[in-house]
Amino acid sequence: MSVHSILFSSEHVTEGHPDKLCDQVSDAVLDACLAGDPFSKVACESCAKTGMVMVFGEITTKAVLDYQKIVRNTIKDIGFDSADKGLDYESCNVLVAIEQQSPDICQGLGNFDSEDLGAGDQGMMFGYATDETETLMPLTYELARGLAKKYSELRRSGSLEWARPDAKTQVTVEYDYDTREGKQVLTPKRVAVVLISAQHDEHVTNDKISVDLMEKVIKAVIPANMLDAETKYWLNPSGRFVRGGPHGDAGLTGRKIIVDTYGGWGAHGGGAFSGKDPSKVDRSAAYAARWIAKSIVAGGLARRCLVQLAYAIGVAEPLSMHVETYGTGKYDDAKLLEIVKQNFKLRPYDIIQELNLRRPIYYDTSRFGHFGRKDELGTGGFTWEVPKKMVE
């Protein structure tokens, strides 16, 4: 066993990516439901293509919703205000196909305000944390997200006058991977590759795009000591990217689950988040798993941590729990699992109560990731990012 170098990559997308647009529409609908009825049962999907956005799914709520207004305001907020950008919030078609939740599912879950509330579906959910950044998120992810956020910020402010809403970023980091003494310790060394594909107007030159992305985005986000003469840059490598948003590619809720989580690190159970109320453990238990993993790393109990939870539909208690610290734990993983069980209640009701999830806090999560963030909009969200002091 030794120390050797590895390369690992993570990607991110801006709010104008067609799949992300759909995530935001679904969570905007969810927030509207929860604002009017905290006990709403929501499973809202969205899809988008040229000149069209459709919301569909199952919703049971006392809230009165204006779907047309919610969808159009979301599209406007993203920045799609003309057809040549990929979508026009004023003229696009908004289609709605919403039904009530299946009575079979509803009766199987029990009272939404009961401690015995059953999980909304089966599945396994993962949470991950690492000490390589202040947010306890992977560096590859934080850098890719940082590039996407900076691009969006400059686009919105007009500092990138040619920029349009749809963009993707990707960062490859070289790590020292130390496997001595049975551990798996990762130490970031340098940024090996930076990739940005940014939608632009038809007048700007490729050279102008490259200079702006390098000077205003990359150098503003990635520390200079992480870049070197060997770092490779791919800036709009396809050449031109005028047609973007839903005009360029169809969008669908739930297709950016790695962007939503840890950039490929840890693991993923497959369930998406957006458009789902907190009785759906795809969302609430994934938030709880991150809360546990972050609490372990923040508390100095491990340098890296992966947590898995598993549930059955209609059953309140998790079927299984697993903690993996990659040999970096203060205690062995079995001991850490016992500490977790002593400090966290993980029935859906308990997760919802502890993290205060029956509130309209989800729209902000639907762009730029669900983890490693603070409450930037003042909605009281991201409670799962506040580590819990655990009794050992």
UniProtKB/Swiss-Prot annotation:
Family matches, as PROSITE patterns: ADOMET_SYNTHASE_1, ADOMET_SYNTHASE_2
Name used for this protein in its record: S-adenosylmethionine synthase
Gene that encodes the chain: METK
Enzyme Commission numbers on file: 2.5.1.6
Question: Binding residues for Mg(2+), per the UniProt record?
Answer: 11
Question: What GO biological process, any one, is recorded here?
Answer: one-carbon metabolic process
Q: Which cofactor does it need?
A: Mg(2+); K(+)
Positions contributing to K(+) binding: 45
Instruction: Name the UniProt key words of this record, in alphabetical order.
Output: ATP-binding, Magnesium, Metal-binding, Nucleotide-binding, One-carbon metabolism, Potassium, Transferase
Q: Please give the InterPro entries that the UniProt record associates with this protein.
A: ADOMET_SYNTHASE_CS, S-AdoMet_synt_C, S-AdoMet_synt_central, S-AdoMet_synt_N, S-AdoMet_synthetase, S-AdoMet_synthetase_sfam
Q: What does this protein do?
A: Catalyzes the formation of S-adenosylmethionine from methionine and ATP. The reaction comprises two steps that are both catalyzed by the same enzyme: formation of S-adenosylmethionine (AdoMet) and triphosphate, and subsequent hydrolysis of the triphosphate.
The GO molecular function terms of this record are: ATP binding; metal ion binding; methionine adenosyltransferase activity
Q: Does the keyword Ligase apply?
A: no
Top-rank taxon, per record = Eukaryota
Signal peptide feature range: none
Judged by the first EC level, this protein's enzyme class is transferase
Catalysed reaction(s) here are:
L-methionine + ATP + H2O = S-adenosyl-L-methionine + phosphate + diphosphate
- Family of the protein in this entry: Belongs to the AdoMet synthase family.
- Residue sites binding L-methionine per the record: 58, 101, 249, 280
- Transferase is among the record's keywords: yes
How this chain assembles, per its entry, is: Homodimer.
Residues that hold ATP according to the record: 17, 166-168, 238-241, 249, 255-256, 272, 276, 280
Pathway(s) the chain acts in: Amino-acid biosynthesis; S-adenosyl-L-methionine biosynthesis; S-adenosyl-L-methionine from L-methionine: step 1/1
UniProt-listed Gene3D superfamilies: 3.30.300.10
Species lineage, top-down?
Eukaryota, Discoba, Euglenozoa, Kinetoplastea, Metakinetoplastina
Cofactor, free-text remark? Binds 2 magnesium ions per subunit. The magnesium ions interact primarily with the substrate.
